[in-house]
Regions:
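Short, well-structured active-site flanking segments
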Residues: 92-124
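Residue-level preference for non-acidic, small/hydrophobic
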Residues: 83-90, 131, 156, 237, ...
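Active-site SXXK
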Residues: 76-102, 339
């Protein structure tokens, strides 16, 4: 397990230096798409957190944060970004089970059943790979059954990420209401109770969104209420990925209980493109292009991509909100930085009607903005 090399060493820039204004200088770019989003930043609930990584002569890193409209108290729907901490805690829980003398690891085959319904046996590795490659809802929901809501929320609070709250599973999934019974290959039950203390998001704004919403096929002329939906603030979700990439920068009580092998496993799957590893099975379907599940850098590119630039990430897309939490690195040119952002693109203000400006506004914005940050980092490092 990781030992603390030194206490948390994070520098956050609040001054108005030229570099601090780099986010706004890009947002004010002449490119029409970026400028239009910036001019309507409140409407788009735009939040951006960009972190530079500086290293001293010995290679010790420190973080320098730049932020734009980041507000822990202003709600946005995190969607599938919640799957990142779910996967992390799954690996942590496997470590705990091994300490309790269970013979289990990511490659162990598990049986998954509910009443008369039985899924094909899978491994935790299979489930996690599906989550990172194609954001599989069903795989994520099995892991929620493995962890339990209360365990998840307690662990988030424990390491100082209390603005990440899990209240429900992911849809669409035909088996979303199944309380899966999970057993290891020794036929021992390893799933958790889904009994939960439902957490209401108090002291949080923007919990009612839209002018109308669709429910069970009918349009209701009232906002959609997110008080009991999943929650993840941009800063805390960004904190998850920072703990994965640079765990040594966090003191022991603020880290996940993971091994070096766990961290390497996470980094591998977070950075895969769809055409790599078992992802090749998905590329037979035209919707799963090479950079599927990557908004930053490649989001608006469905053709060949620059393999030198790796994006370690988990994105979310639902209810008109797009979010990406990422660490971006070019190993050949030694460029690396963290970038997390969320944007709301729902011009008609009707929630759950599947009419959102993802393809013509949200995704192109995130892709182009991140490329601009990348170019800035590239120039800064050389």
């Amino acid at each position: 397990m990781y030992k603390p090399l030194f206490s948390l060493f994070v520098i956050i820039c609040f001054s108005c230096s030229s570099e601090h204004n780099q986010i706004e200088s890009i947002l004010k770019d002449k490119k029409t798409l970026i400028k239009n989003v910036y001019q309507n930043k409140e409407k788009h609930n735009l939040q951006i957190l960009y972190t530079q990584i500086e290293k001293d002569s010995a290679g010790n890193p420190k973080f320098i944060e730049h932020h734009f409209q980041v507000d822990d108290r202003k709600y946005f729907y995190p969607a599938s970004t919640m799957k990142l901490p779910i996967v992390v805690l799954t690996l942590q829980r496997l470590n705990e089970l091994r300490n309790e003398s269970f013979n289990i690891n990511v490659d162990s085959r598990i049986s998954i059943s509910f009443n008369e319904t039985k899924r094909e046996e899978e491994t935790f590795k299979d489930l996690i790979a599906k989550i990172f490659l194609v954001s599989d809802n069903s795989a994520s929901n099995v892991l929620i059954n493995f962890l339990g809501y209360n365990y998840f929320n307690e662990q988030m609070r424990k390491i100082g990420l209390s603005n990440i709250v899990l209240n429900h599973k992911f849809n669409p999934d035909p088996f979303v209401n199944n309380n899966w019974n999970i057993k290891n290959d020794e036929n021992k039950i390893i799933s958790s109770s889904l009994a939960q203390t439902l957490i209401e998001h108090k002291k949080t704004s923007n919990l009612k969104q839209g002018k109308a919403h669709i429910s069970n096929g009918d349009k209701t002329k009232s906002p959609l209420d997110f008080r009991f939906k999943n929650r993840g603030s941009l800063r805390d979700l960004d904190g998850v990925i920072k703990r994965i990439i640079y765990p040594e920068l966090f003191d022991e009580k603020s880290r996940f209980n993971l091994t070096d092998e766990d961290y390497n496993f996470l980094r591998y799957w977070m950075s895969r493109f769809t055409y790599e590893d078992i992802g090749r099975d998905y590329t037979k379907d035209s919707i799963y292009f090479d950079s599927y599940n990557k908004f930053f850098i490649y989001g608006d590119i469905t053709s060949s991509i620059d393999k030198k630039i790796r994006v370690y990430n988990k994105l979310g897309q639902a209810y008109g909100t797009l979010t990406d939490i990422s660490y971006i690195k070019n190993y050949e040119e030694n460029v690396e930085f963290f970038l997390s952002a969320t944007i709301y693109v729902n011009d008609n203000e009707i929630m759950n009607d599947d009419v959102y400006e993802y393809e013509n506004k949200g995704i192109p914005f995130l892709a182009e903005f991140s490329r601009q940050i990348y170019q800035f980092e590239k120039l800064r490092k050389h």
